[in-house]
Amino acid sequence: MGIMIKKRNGRKEVLDITKIQKMTIESTLGLDGVSQSELELDAQIKFIDGMSSSDIQDALIKTAVEKIDIDVPNWTFVAARLFVFDLYHRVGKATHGIKGEPYCHLKDYLKYGKDAGRLIPNLGEGYDLDDLNSYIDPSRDFLFNYLGIKTLYDRYLIKNNKAEPIELPQHMFMAIAMFLAQDEK
């Protein structure tokens, strides 16, 4: 029997290494000087029986961060991708109930943010939200390095009253643009 983990929903199950492999493959894809197997093996040293799936994600991120070096700078993008995957999971679960789904429609984001009291009530009025939503491209989130996405998360992304993130980078940038241009004719 393998390592038992506690899922985010409280359920316990045996650690499925194929899920970790999928995550590590996606996080290293197309980046020079980084190794999926190295990330996976080094992170597994930190896995202990009873840890949560959230702790496993944190271990993967920390392992990638520890590997950032002037000689292998792409580890910062691995750490950033892992962080973004976790952010997608957390925001999706909190806002539209679909864990891991990158972005809900802009209308849904605005409604949730307003209902949570985190966005101004008239934000989005007078805009073609379907058109603006078509400009959201989740692949842009992977242009951040780790320090960039971590700073954005810590300082700027909106969180609910439980301190859970409810906003993703492109929704934030779109909301800022809509707010700044709202009085333009």
Residue map of PLM features:
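Extended catalytic cores of very large enzyme megasubunits
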Residues: M1-K185
